[in-house]
Amino acid sequence: MDNNDYKKFYLIREDVLPESVVKTLKIKDALKNNPELSIYEAVKLFDLSRSAFYKYRETIFPVDEKMLDHREFTLILYVNDIVGMLAQVLNTVSKLQLSVLTIHQSVPMEEKATITLSLSAKDTTISIDEIIKALRNIEHVSKVELISMSM
């Protein structure tokens, strides 16, 4: 592949996307869920110009959509330094049918630590959002962030 053809990818939160990009995602979802809906009808329904839809439709996609092919990603968990914390996290990972590729737990400072997990979700259909929510629901986990993903 020529270096001029390479396009960089970014993970970006939905709430900071321009309205036209968010509408494009909604239109793509509507078209996927209703094969009888035409592009003309869909852009009217979501009040977006066809030119804006065509501009963004091949450049924006939900993280989970790309994860279907390559289901490897890395998360960082911010946790309280509690005995058995890592075991609780790994138990949840196991219940979600995820495979651990790499794991690193930082040295605790001020009773806080981080756990970095590289995971494979090839044996499950659960979405990345559901995985993050499940890990956030563990007692003493204060934050979970997606920091990388294979594409």
From Swiss-Prot:
Transmembrane segments: none annotated. It comes from the Bacteria. Gene3D superfamilies: 3.30.70.260. InterPro entries: ACT-like_dom_sf (IPR045865), ACT_dom (IPR002912), UPF0735_ACT_dom-cont (IPR008310). Residues 74-149 form the ACT domain. Belongs to the UPF0735 family. HAMAP family: UPF0735. This is UPF0735 ACT domain-containing protein SH1278.
